[in-house]
Each structure stands twice: as C-alpha cells, then as structure tokens.
C-alpha cells in the first residue's frame, strides 16, 4: 500500500503529484491494468515472446548504425 504523508502547509496538488510519482515508481497501475481481465497463459507467452523479439531487433538496430560523417 502506497502512502504519502502530507507535510505541514503543503498544497494538495504537490502531495497528489508525489503520490502519483510513488504509484508510478512501484508499478502498481501497470499491474492493475494487466490483472483487470484474465489473460490465457498462451497469450501471456505470446506477448512476452513478441516483446523479446522487439527488444532484440531494437538492440540490433542500435548496433548497426552507420558511422557519422560529420
């Protein structure tokens, strides 16, 4: 459970911003969205495999950059 203690004379907007930042850092919203609906195990494997392929191609593209001419 993420908690944020509001400091004395602290505006609500700043406390809300700190709360949102802490939620984002813990990854709570992404996990909540992932668990909102049931996902079949085959769909999970397929999604993870596609992400791994995408990461691999991204890494290869960055390694094969042509030399800069300037």
Curated annotation (Swiss-Prot):
InterPro entries: Ribosomal_bS21, Ribosomal_bS21_sf. One of its GO terms (cellular component) is ribosome. It comes from the Bacteria. The keyword ATP-binding does not apply. The keyword Ribonucleoprotein applies. One of its GO terms (molecular function) is structural constituent of ribosome. Belongs to the bacterial ribosomal protein bS21 family. This is Small ribosomal subunit protein bS21. It comes from Nitrosomonas europaea (strain ATCC 19718 / CIP 103999 / KCTC 2705 / NBRC 14298).
């Amino acid at each position: 459970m993420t908690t944020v203690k509001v400091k004395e004379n602290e505006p609500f907007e700043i406390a809300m911003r700190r709360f949102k930042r802490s939620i984002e850092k813990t990854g709570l919203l992404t996990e909540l969205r992932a668990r909102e609906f049931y996902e079949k195990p085959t769909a999970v494997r397929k999604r993870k495999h596609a992400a791994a392929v995408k990461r691999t191609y991204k890494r290869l593209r960055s390694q094969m950059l042509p030399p800069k001419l300037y």
